[in-house]
Design a protein with these regions (language model features):
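Positively charged, small/polar-rich N-terminal and surface patches that mediate targeting and assembly
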Residues: 1-117, 123-168
Length: 168
């Protein structure tokens, strides 16, 4: 079973600071990172900056399409017109098919705001107590997460994985 987690930080650079800790956990085989992305939202900006993470030791990237669609749904709906907003609203229902429910989306929208940042990780096989203990040594964070069933994870990989065929 995979977990999609957003590690929310009270500073715009907290997510970047946590990367070394997360990579150390991966090297110690305490967590298996499938894919990840960072959102930074400087206080003087209307919209956040997003960046997909590329690490050769992560097991299998979902690709930019997944992160682009997720971040569009999470952060850019307030900035688009009603017609596009309605289409993205329908997309929210589609994400629930992958185990990314309305509660996860709502919490991220409410908590990742100007002046904050978030490290988004899709992980599996975490040794939870050791991961939580290691993260206590980094910047203060709040965890927002949702668990995916094996079927939902497979569906995500099929739809958005690097090996996925292009849809017309």
């Amino acid at each position: 079973m995979a977990t999609l987690a957003a590690f929310k930080f009270d500073t715009a650079d907290g997510a970047e600071q946590m990367l070394d800790i997360v990579e150390g956990l991966q090297k110690q085989q305490l967590i298996d990172i499938i894919d990840g992305a960072i959102v930074t939202w400087p206080t003087d900006k209307k919209k956040p900056k997003t960046k997909q993470m590329y690490h050769t030791n992560w097991t299998g990237a979902l690709g930019g399409a997944f992160w682009g669609m997720l971040f569009g749904l999470l952060f850019f709906i307030p900035f688009v017109g009603l017609a596009i907003g309605a289409a993205l609203g329908a997309l929210a229902g589609h994400f629930s098919d992958y185990g990314i429910d309305d509660n996860f989306i709502k919490q991220v929208r409410e908590k990742v705001t100007p002046g904050t940042s978030a490290l988004f990780l899709l992980t599996q096989n975490a040794v939870t107590d050791k991961v939580v203990d290691a993260m206590k040594h980094g910047p203060k964070l709040e965890v927002i997460s949702t668990n995916l069933t094996k079927e939902q994870e497979d569906k995500l990989r099929e739809e958005f994985g690097e090996e996925a065929p292009a849809h017309a």
